[in-house]
Every structure is written in structure tokens, then in C-alpha cells.
């Protein structure tokens, strides 16, 4: 009898212990269910915005003040034995609104990178993600929330919620329309580069001939197909900029080989990376003979590079007014 009672007590205690061990998992599961239900209910309203605003085209396109005749660049490539197979039209979806978003991302990348990478990791599934920001600095929290707010306003996020102290969490779910996937998986970085170039061309009031050739699909002299990111010229100088938001290891050597094929005193090749410290970039530059830049230093570098072409600097007040009109 005593043995039987002990057995029952042990069984009861075991069940209680199992219950206690599973409390946290149950709570977490309930939180996930509640979040999912909130997202589903919220999307019924928010998806109406998506239909109306998925392709907001601004009348002040970033290229309006730039001569986009790329003949000089194309002639240079042909002289190097390169065949231009296809040049896509400028993407009308990447308008001033998205250029402004790309500029925000590029100029504040170190502050938003954790949230950006969390969003990017959910683009294939569209699932919600909870981001714990307890270890973020106040600046990182502020910029991350601003970033998510901007994405949400543009319907790039299906759902966004910020939980203040003591939780300090962001809960979000990305929108999976092609525009969003294309932009956030990497095209934002190209857009950032183009936007910064255009901004400085206006700032320095450059009167030299300026042109762009974006994403041309080419055939190299050895028959290999290749696609370049950004080519732009100022006067006789051509700048070639490749950009990578993730794994760069398989590309550096390829870019280096293409740079050797295109080698000229008028060609300036660069590789822009987001996840690599400048010290490592310097080592890659020395190893592959192609200037490698970290995103944190890109704006300053570009400023110094284009300053040599300045006619005169537009007064700061006029510059700010112009930017405000384009945003």
C-alpha cells in the first residue's frame, strides 16, 4: 500500500515537473499563435494599401538631371573586345522614394544591419520574426525602428510592431511581392550607390559630361558571359562599381580578372561590401589589385573622388531644398 502511494506521488510529481518544464514552451507557442492571428487580421486591412501603393512613381526621377547617353562607356568596352549583349531599361519602380530609402539604409547600415538581416532571412518564407533589441544601443533601437517604420509605410512589411521597455522587441513580417524581394535582397545597395553619385554630382555642380550604364549583360573576349553592376563616367574617367550584400568570396577573384581585361588608366574599378571591416577590405585590395570598400567609408570616399570635378559647391541651403523637393 505504501509502495503504491509512493508510486502515485512520484507519478504526480513527474507530471508536475513536466508541466513546469513545458510552461515556457507553452507560453512561447501561445505568443506565436497570438502574433500570427494578429498578423492575419491586420493584413486584411493593410493589403488594401499594397494594391494602391505597390508601384509609387515619383515625377522627379533621380536621373532627370543626368545625361544618360552611355555611348562613351559602350565604346570603351567594345575597344576592350567586350560585346554588350543586353542593357536593361532603367527600372521605373526604383524611383525617388526608393532611392531615398536606399540612401537611409546605406548611410546607417551599421545601426540597422541586425534588423535588415533578420528581414532578409524571412523573405523566402514571409514568416514573422521577433527581434530582441535588449542588447542594442539606444541609437541602434532608434534607427532600427525608423527603418521598419519606413518599410511598413511603403508596404514592404505586412506587419510591424514595436514593444517598448521592458521587452524592447520588434515583431515583423515581410511582404513577398517581387519588388520587395528584389530590392531587399541586394538591389537597394546598387540604388544607394547611384543615389549618392547623383547627389554629389548636383552638390559639386559638375559640368563635365556624366553618363551611366547600369547592369549591362556582356560577353568577355574569352566568351564568358558576365553582368556588371554600375558603370558611370565623368569626363574621360570611367568608374566601375560592384556591390555585394552577402557572400563575396566567390566573386572577388572574378571581378579582379575582369578588371585586368578592362585595364586602363581611365578605368577605376571598385567593390563595395556591407559585412566586411575596412581592415579586411584593405587586405583584399592588396591581394586582388581592385579597390575594395566598406559601406561605412563609401560616402566619404565618393565625396573625395568626385570633388576633383566640382565647378563650385552649391550653397548648403540650396542643396537641402533640392533634396527636400526630391524626397
Task: List PLM regions with ranges.
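Intrinsically disordered, low-complexity Ser/Thr/Pro/Gly-rich regulatory segments
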Residues: 30, 48-327
